[in-house]
Amino acid sequence: MQINKAALEIFDFTSSLAVYSEHELKIGEQDIHDYIAGHVTKAFKDPGARTGTLHAHSPMGKRIGEYKSGEISFITLAKELGEKTFDYMKQATVGVVIDTIVCDVVTDTNYICMLLCQAHDAFTHQLFSEDDGSLSTELVPHKAVLPMPTQKLRAFIAINTLDLSVRIFEPKGEYDGEVCYILADKVLQLGTDQSSRDTVKKVKTIIDKVAQAHESDGVAELTMAKSMIAKNAEVSDTVNPIRIVEEVFKSNPIQQEAAKKELAEQDMMRPLPVNREFATKVGEHHKIKTDTGIEISFPVEYMQNREFIEIKTNDDGTLRIELKNINKIVNK
């Protein structure tokens, strides 16, 4: 990843004060470059990110075009994006300091990214020399420490400067009494698809709901769905919920139609974007919990192989779980 340019802006919502830099960050310094690159890399993989596309004639779409053509500078673009963000957020955000990094990034293509880093309190050590020449150490508080790249950003925007496609994650906020996504709905004026996490969660919920409504525990259906999602991620960055429910309920047309009705109500009757790394992890394990408090986690593919695990119904209607071919048990 290459960071071409970056600018830092300070949003202090404790005092409703914003500071916009008139100079770029010194990204030639390796530590600064690596800090920004680390956050951007992690944010691109976030399964909570939603996707959409800016209209070329929208206010932000036009400014991105003007930046590409050299009509406006990077600092001008960063400041305008920052000012618009602060103006909308100040009504919905209180009591925090957010340092915002706007950067020009190249990965597979060129992006304008905005990283909202919520500051937090932290402590470090400091060495003091006493009057008698002895040394002492103290804990020193810092009131505005930024999150490390291993920690999640408060919000993130990545705008592809070629096709104006957008990846974005943010918490919901309230503006003029309306609960909304401030960055997507107000700053960018952008409609988005649901996130990978929401897509997978809704597919699983629908399959489980339909299965249990037709006197099944849903375990076999859910493990099949998770396996399909994971295998699909090997070749595609979209998932088709219709194909999944058709395959899971292929022997039961009534359940199939019930699941499709649920998908239609959730506006999921079409292929939806999905983070391939996240989708692959979804298919690794399945976890079940009994009404007696026992929890079991097992590889998804084991449900297709009765040599390892099998769920049976007893004569009295209760269930039993058989774990087979075990050579060793390890306490954890």
Residues covered by each model-derived region:
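C-terminal structured domains
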Residues: E246-K332
